[in-house]
Curated annotation (Swiss-Prot):
Protein name from the UniProt record: Ribulose bisphosphate carboxylase large chain
Encoding gene per record: cbbL
Cofactor(s) of this protein: Mg(2+)
CDD domains membership: RuBisCO_large_I (cd08212)
Enzyme Commission number(s) of this protein: 4.1.1.39
Length: 485
């Protein structure tokens, strides 16, 4: 169906139930304005439901419609405020699924509010009965809207200047085990990892303030470790102090204490909510702190291919919200991450302008209006033996976090950190010399290991570790398998 079937005039406002496509929510001749917010949904209608009607219903229920005609529509600029589904395409190789392109007038959204944006776009509509499933695949955010957000508080360029580290990925590690350590032992892990050559250590998502270690105790021991490691190495170091708590008041208190102790970075979890994230981002900018976001909980709605919200959308929202770091996948690690899809995530974080790239799952051109760049973080099941693959897939503007790959080293934590640092330095040197480091990677690492016993032990310990599983979320226009490690 390529023509409009909208009912016009008085008949449009007769009491009763009317199909969404006849109420003005299906407008195939509509040309989106530069100022429109555009959303791409993957729509899976119930059996027997017209895909055009299902898509129009998504447009209606995410903007101005309800289940019946209401006369109060005539008191508004209804033609302007209705979301308009203007294109519906079958999803390649996915029978019964459709891509619905929906345009929203900018006036429907509050400036600078992810909470308001998400309340409309992913509000009630995801529970709509005529749909088997619904997924928000991508969004085009107009420049006029983007400029109402502050963007990353620090950004990649200023972070590198603050850390005095250039020309290579940054190295980190999540403290393990994530729960159960005392404050003193936790601080010892931080010191060993930083002294061994890492740039950062990190709290995990669920370490907050528990009986075995109060948050204040952790902060004190961690910052003591950071200061000692800086003195020993002559390098600037940091540890992501997780300020996530039950209330905003508690989070502000913890962030202020981290600042008083001299930390360069704090951390929050995605589960605190969009408004809390934006609030902490504003605090971080005001107080010159780097803000790390752990994407805890995201896979509950980003992983399934037919229902939920794509992580590329979450990445866009978080760049608007103003965090400086976000976990964005590893390609070769233990967590979900198709190579092409992950490339799309990284481009969203790091580029000033994103062209449409269907092969990476990016459906719209996106102008970031000079917002700072967001540093992606790769963590989860990576080790020194993958350094050539990580550098090739992810580039240099990334934090590579080797948690188990540092703390699980057979010679100890400091040796694990040294192994990762030497592997990275060897690979960067090979890259700068113009070598084909991706294909020569194993040879480069083996040569470096001849003069670095910790690296030799790491390569031997994890040489057979693979996470070769097919990804559940891949670009529909360029299906690719997960990378074999």
């Amino acid at each position: 169906m390529n023509e409009s079937v909208t009912v016009r005039g008085k008949d449009r406002y007769k009491s009763g139930v009317m199909e969404y496509k006849k109420m003005g929510y299906w407008e195939p001749d509509y040309e989106p304005k530069d100022t429109d917010v555009i959303a791409l949904f993957r729509v899976t209608p119930q059996d027997g439901v017209d895909p055009i009607e299902a898509s129009a219903a998504v447009a209606g229920e995410s903007s101005t419609a309800t289940w019946t005609v209401v006369w109060t529509d005539r008191l508004t600029a209804a033609e302007k405020y209705r979301a308009k589904c203007y294109r519906v395409d079958p999803v390649p190789n996915s029978p019964g699924q459709y891509f619905a392109y929906i345009a929203y007038d900018l006036d429907l959204f509050e400036n600078g509010s992810i909470a308001n944006l998400s309340a409309s776009i992913i509000g009630n509509v995801f529970g709509f009965k005529p749909l088997k499933a619904l997924r928000l695949e991508d969004m085009r955010l107009p420049v006029a809207y983007v400029k109402t957000f502050q963007g990353p508080a620090t950004g990649i360029v200023v972070e590198r200047e603050r850390m005095d580290k250039f020309g290579r990925p940054l190295l980190g590690a999540t403290v393990k085990p994530k729960l159960g350590l005392s404050g003193r032992n936790y601080g010892r892990v931080v010191y060993e990892a930083l002294k061994g050559g890492l740039d950062f250590t990190k709290d995990d998502e669920n370490i907050n303030s528990q009986p075995f270690m109060h948050w204040r105790e952790r902060f004190l021991y961690c910052m003591e470790a950071v200061n000692k490691a800086q003195a020993a190495s002559g390098e600037i170091k940091g540890t992501y102090l997780n300020v996530t708590a039950g209330t905003m008041e508690d989070m502000y208190e913890r962030a202020e204490f981290a600042k008083q102790l001299g930390s360069v970075i704090i951390m929050i979890d995605l589960v605190i909510g969009y408004t809390a994230i934006q609030s902490m981002a504003k605090w971080a900018r005001k107080n010159d702190m780097i803000l790390h976001l752990h994407r805890a909980g995201h896979s509950t709605y980003t992983r399934q291919r037919n229902h939920g919200v794509s992580f590329r959308v979450i990445a866009k929202w978080m760049r608007l919200a103003g965090v400086d770091h976000i976990h964005a996948g590893t390609v070769v690690g233990k967590l979900e991450g198709d190579p092409a899809t992950t490339r799309g995530y990284y481009d969203i974080c790091r580029e000033d302008h994103n062209p449409m790239a269907l092969e990476h799952g990016v459906f719209f051109e996106q102008n970031w209006a000079s917002l700072n760049k967001l540093m992606p973080v790769a963590s989860g099941g990576i080790h020194a033996g993958q350094m050539h693959q990580l550098l090739d897939h992810l580039g240099e503007d990334v934090v590579l976090q080797f948690g188990g790959g540092t703390i699980g080293h057979p010679m100890g934590i400091q040796a694990g950190a040294t192994a990762n640092r030497v592997a990275l330095e060897a690979m960067i040197l090979a890259r700068n010399e113009g070598r084909d480091y991706l294909h020569e990677g194993p040879e480069i690492l083996a040569k470096a290991a001849q003069t670095c016993t910790p690296l030799k032990a790491a390569l031997e310990t994890w040489k057979n570790v693979t996470f070769n599983y097919e990804s559940t979320d891949m670009p529909d226009y360029a299906p690719t398998p997960s990378v074999s490690v």
